[in-house]
Amino acid sequence: MMLTELLLVRHGESEANVAAAEADATRALRVAVPARDADVRLSGTGVAQAEALGRRLGGLTDEEAPEALWVSPYRRARQTAELALTTAGLELPTTVDERLRDRELGILDTLTWRGVEQLHPEEAARRVFLGKYYHRPPGGESWVDVKLRLRAALQDLAGSGASRVLVVTHDAVVMLIRAVLEDIGESELLDLSRTQPIRNASITRLVRSGGGWIAEPVNDVSHLEGEALTTEHGGEHHGTRT
């Protein structure tokens, strides 16, 4: 079958999201991340968000429900997917793909922007000059680097045989999958990252239309609003770990 629909989901609020907000509030140089990035868990709110997502998925008809799951190997993404599917009562063939992991920040990992400016002023200057799209921190990735690995992942996903796929991943990956499939360039993508930062446990639906793809809805958190679970953690927008 041809791939016709992607449901892109950012993981629920993580312990690192909470720590990043605290670091910003206290003007800290570093985020007190409780584990290496791949092992960061969901917060209590993140768990509730994942369960609310599951109730949303459980309400889909057979014609709307995903047929397969592709998920980042990072714990917060896997935890979101597992909680959501359990709550929804769905059992899906699952692919854990490292190409869906969060962007690697290299020497800037766990730093707030204030920390980058004070501890690595030369990288702060390079980031300002090159812009977020092309800047590659030492030991890390630019957005373009992430796009390259996502192009390969999307080719494999398209050949997997499923027509509707749930993808649980990270905010930068959601934006960059849109960039690949909708052919969004640097300027428009940076505008989207500023004006529409991807929210925790949000759903962005991409549907094949003619020779291209259309996103509708984008960043949907209606399943969280009734339960007062919407959180604002800008992730890539603020330059902190997501």
Residue ranges and their predicted role:
Residues 1-66, 79-90, 210-242:
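An N-terminal RHG(E/S)-centered segment typical of histidine phosphatases
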Residues 3, 91, 151-214:
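Active-site-adjacent alpha-helix immediately C-terminal to a catalytic or transition-state-stabilizing loop
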Residues 11-12, 71-75, 93, 99, ...:
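Short, well-ordered beta-to-alpha junction loops that form the rim of enzyme active sites
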Residues 32-41, 125-144:
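Short glycine/proline- and acidic residue-enriched helix-loop micro-motifs
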Residues 48-125, 187, 195, 199-200, ...:
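Phosphate-coordination/substrate-recognition cap region in phosphate-metabolizing enzymes
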Residues 54, 82-85, 147, 154, ...:
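Non-transmembrane alpha-helical segments in soluble domains
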Residues 136-159:
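Internal catalytic-core helix/loop-beta-alpha segment
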